Curated annotation (Swiss-Prot):
It comes from the Bacteria. It holds the Pfam family RNase_HII. GO terms for biological process: DNA replication, removal of RNA primer; mismatch repair. This is Ribonuclease HII. The lineage of its organism: Bacteria, Bacillati, Actinomycetota, Actinomycetes, Kineosporiales. Its cofactor is Mn(2+); Mg(2+). Residues 236-246 have a biased composition (Low complexity). Residues 236-262 are annotated as: Disordered.
């Protein structure tokens, strides 16, 4: 049975290979909110070590779980992990530096919350957006990235990328569940301030009710105004989104009507 189908549970096989190779702490990292029209992009990090036991029953990539299953798993995942955290980059930061640099910022904020930095990060996908860019960017000025006084990891831990790591690696799947449930809670809370957009249900993605509200009411401060928001004219004075490796992967047509919305 192919693990890509989600029917084979993720395991610690890859994490344990790295632990046996001499890494004391290995972290799984995954993001959520990349393709959303509103709200933050969020990055979860979950750390395991050689003593970490088998993952909680039912753990899967967050996109393969119902909201109720994710919520039930989240506290179990936190107790199972050696350490865990979720970091965010807000819409204004995404507009200022672009989605890839915003992912890096959110990931570094998550790593900065850990009591001890991991020796190695397993990052879902094939693009390393967590490590320092080859050239300085607006991100450096925005959040003091690279300055130890800013409380952010400097330098970033070693990173290895794995396609479908959120499906096959338990630490990454756990990170995806924590990132998703944390961001969902944030968007539900922000729904109270901006109820027109239906964020309690669509979580900021381009569901029909959100698109209808955008057409009727326009964008609010929680929207990513540098993006091409359906039915909304580009905001004056907002910089064009900065492009970078992986930016083309942004999907603003994500369907959150099923458990697969992330």
């Amino acid at each position: 049975m192919s693990p890509a189908g989600g029917r084979v549970p993720p395991s610690l096989r890859l994490e344990r290979q790295f632990l046996r190779a001499g890494h004391a702490l290995v972290a799984g990292v995954d993001e959520v909110g990349r393709g959303s029209l509103a709200g933050p992009v969020s990055v979860g990090v979950l750390v395991v070590d050689a003593a970490t036991r088998t993952a909680p029953t039912g753990l899967r990539d967050s996109k393969l779980l119902t909201p109720a299953a994710r919520e039930a798993l989240a506290p179990k995942v936190r107790r199972w992990a050696v350490a865990s955290a979720v970091g965010h980059a807000e819409p204004g930061e995404i507009d200022a530096v672009g989605i890839v640099a915003a992912l890096r910022l959110a990931g570094r904020r998550a790593l900065a919350q850990l009591p001890v930095p991991p020796d190695l990060v397993i990052l879902d996908g094939n693009h390393d957006w967590l490590s320092d860019p080859r050239e300085p960017s607006l991100l450096d000025a925005l959040d003091g990235l690279g300055d130890p006084a800013a409380g952010l990891p400097c330098p970033a831990p070693a990173v290895t990328t794995r396609v479908k790591a959120d499906v096959t690696c338990a630490a990454v799947a756990g990170a995806s569940v924590l990132a998703k449930t944390t961001r969902d809670a944030l968007m539900t809370a922000r729904h109270e301030e901006f109820p027109h957009y239906g964020w309690a249900g669509n979580k900021g993605y381009s569901a029909p009710d959100h698109l209808e509200a955008l057409a009727a009411h326009g964008a609010c401060p929680q929207h990513r105004r540098s993006w091409r928001l359906p039915g909304v004219a580009a905001a004056a004075g907002v910089p064009a989104p900065r492009s970078g490796p992986g930016d083309a992967l942004v999907d603003v047509t994500s369907d959150t009507s099923s458990p697969r919305g992330a």
